[in-house]
Amino acid sequence: MIKLESLQDPSPRKRRKKLLGRGPGSGHGKTSGRGHKGDGSRSGYKRRFGYEGGGVPLYRRVPTRGFSHARFDECVEEITTQRLNSLFNEGEEITLDALKQKKAIDKHAIRVKVIVKGELEKTFIWKDANVVLSQGVRNLIGVA
């Protein structure tokens, strides 16, 4: 037999939807649970993600961790002797701008390093201070 004290709330799926704006007896009349004035009482209002009622939100209370070096990193590219052989002709000057023009390096690069891969089949002019030669390339062309 069912007794009054043994009654349970219906499961959330069977619970009646709360009716808003249907008189003071419903508990959700007049302002329909929205309170008086302010943004929350207006139609179309949605709280910003992380908003905590005007207090300092958690994401601002918790200290930041780590450090990003991206702002200070210099964009240094590398290019092989094999690639230089295919891109440039005999006796051409190899500069940062020439490499950027031929799209051999990134347009944001501020320095390029030449590394050994295969032989250097042609002679080039190396005057640009932003084109750095590795020790192996220096040995190939005979510069100490």
Swiss-Prot record:
The keyword Ribonucleoprotein applies. InterPro entries: Ribosomal_uL15, Ribosomal_uL15/eL18_sf, Ribosomal_uL15_bac-type. GO terms for biological process: translation. GO terms for cellular component: cytosolic large ribosomal subunit. Residues 1-52 are annotated as: Disordered. Belongs to the universal ribosomal protein uL15 family. This is Large ribosomal subunit protein uL15. It comes from Chlamydia felis (strain Fe/C-56) (Chlamydophila felis).
